[in-house]
Design a protein with these regions (language model features):
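Divalent metal-coordination and catalytic microenvironments
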Residues: 8, 43, 53, 86, ...
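Cap/insert and terminal regions of metallo-dependent hydrolase folds
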Residues: 66, 71-74, 178, 184-266
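Beta-strand-turn-beta hairpins that frame and shape the catalytic cleft
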Residues: 2-8, 44-49, 158-165, 183-187
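Active-site metal-binding loops of divalent metal-dependent hydrolases
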Residues: 13-14, 54-57, 94, 115-116, ...
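Active-site metal-binding motif and surrounding structural segment of the metallo-beta-lactamase
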Residues: 66-112
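Conserved beta-strand hairpin/beta-sheet module of binuclear metal-dependent hydrolase folds
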Residues: 13-78, 178-192
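Metallo-beta-lactamase
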Residues: 2, 70-81, 85, 115-168, ...
């Protein structure tokens, strides 16, 4: 494996049953079942594993009425990855489903955008409509990591290790960043919540919980430009990811899939 080529995995840890009108600004005339899945991602390279996002735990799932499928720690363990061995964690943004489990990676340095920390600790959090997807304990835990010297801040585009770069997209959250990973198939983009579902970026539609609509829709084209091909942009919450990509190994179907593989059309 070249020093900048990585394997890439999506780990499903949660689920939320909901209908399609809940997933789009303006609703959806079809009004069909359209659930969301919750993922974290493992980026495995010669220098070790980088984790993108940290999910939430069972207690937070109950509080937010989200179903916990399997703990994040177990998903990593299924790939032979020990959580306490992780040295770098990328946080796409500070919403509850992306930055919980804040004690799971005791050795890690956390990478996030300047704008996201400023957003999550500034005047916007005075407004319920904007702070709703944040959990104060998660944000405070990240502030503590700053004071412990365990955070690295990025402004726009930056390299984490050779072959892995972060890119500020914004939109859904002010400091939202997506991740571009060099793989055997070329660059694959982990959109995180820059596109919750394939239907968002493919149809130019917008998830209702949004800080800046313009940044969302402009971001779709940018995600596709960053990838080797439009089909190599992986959305953050789409159950179709588990159908389009193969299981990481036998027995992990519907739980852990390998993303540096050609996706099926389903």
């Amino acid at each position: 494996m070249a020093e900048d080529i990585h394997e890439l995995y999506a780990i499903r840890y949660g689920h939320h049953a909901r209908r399609s009108p809940d997933n789009f600004i303006g609703g959806d005339l079809h009004d069909v079942l359209q659930p969301l899945d919750f993922f974290v991602w493992a980026i495995v390279g010669p220098s070790g594993t980088i984790v993108l996002d940290t999910g939430f735990d069972e207690a937070m799932g109950k509080k937010r009425q989200r179903e916990m499928i399997k703990p994040v720690r177990d998903g990593l363990a299924a790939l032979g990855i020990a959580a306490d061995s992780i040295k770098d964690v990328i946080i796409s943004h500070l919403h509850y489903d992306h930055c919980g489990n804040y004690d799971l990676f005791p050795q890690a340095r956390y990478h996030l955008q300047d704008r996201e920390m400023a957003y999550a600790t500034g005047r916007c959090m005075c407004h319920q409509a904007l702070r709703a997807p944040f959990e104060v304990d998660d944000v405070v835990a990240m502030v503590r990591k700053v004071f412990a010297g365990r955070c690295a801040f990025h402004d726009g585009e930056d390299e984490i290790v050779p072959g892995v770069t972060v890119h500020h997209i914004g939109g859904h959250s002010k400091g939202l960043q997506s991740v571009r990973v060099k793989t055997r198939l070329g660059p694959i983009v982990l959109a995180a919540d820059a596109s919750h579902l394939y239907a968002h970026m493919d149809g130019g539609r917008v998830y209702p919980l949004t800080y800046n609509v313009e940044e969302v829709v402009e971001g779709y084209a940018r995600l596709k430009r960053l990838a080797a091909a439009p089909g190599h942009v992986v959305p953050g919450h789409d159950p179709l990811v588990l159908k389009r990509y193969p299981a990481a190994r036998p027995g992990l179907e519907g739980w852990v899939v390998r993303l540096d593989a050609e996706p099926k059309q389903v």
